[in-house]
């Protein structure tokens, strides 16, 4: 991962909560609707983080307000009732900053022999 200067407006959001991290993480692959986000989070976390609808939609609302995700429109009649979300540019920068922070933490733990490389 290339080390770049993280803007203060993004740094102040770190560290991310698990719910925020996982939502940004799964949206990095492309737009998804709420239920798909919830199921993908469960999958990528290996079942270690299960997000209920209350947490999901409260967190989505907060991410929209922070400009980390955007609501997209769908042209499909069958999908019109569902709201789809995608990562914004700021959301991608925030996710990258958090991944870099986590990577640094893991390297530090490896140097201290707390985990094996």
Regions found by a protein language model. Give the residues of each.
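N-terminal helix-turn-helix DNA-binding core of bacterial DNA-binding proteins
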Residues: 11-55
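Amphipathic alpha-helical dimerization/coiled-coil segments
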Residues: 93-117
């Amino acid at each position: 991962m290339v080390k770049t200067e993280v803007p203060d407006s993004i740094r102040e959001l770190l560290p991310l909560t698990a719910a925020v991290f996982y939502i940004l993480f799964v949206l990095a692959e492309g737009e998804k609707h709420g239920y798909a986000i919830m199921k993908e989070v469960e999958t990528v976390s290996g079942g270690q983080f299960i997000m209920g609808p209350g947490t999901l939609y409260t967190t989505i609302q907060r991410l929209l307000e922070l400009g980390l995700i955007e609501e997209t429109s769908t042209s499909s009649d069958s999908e019109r009732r569902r709201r789809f979300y995608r990562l914004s540019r700021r959301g991608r920068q925030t996710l990258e900053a958090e991944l870099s922070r986590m990577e640094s933490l893991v390297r530090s733990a490896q140097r201290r022999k707390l985990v094996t490389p």
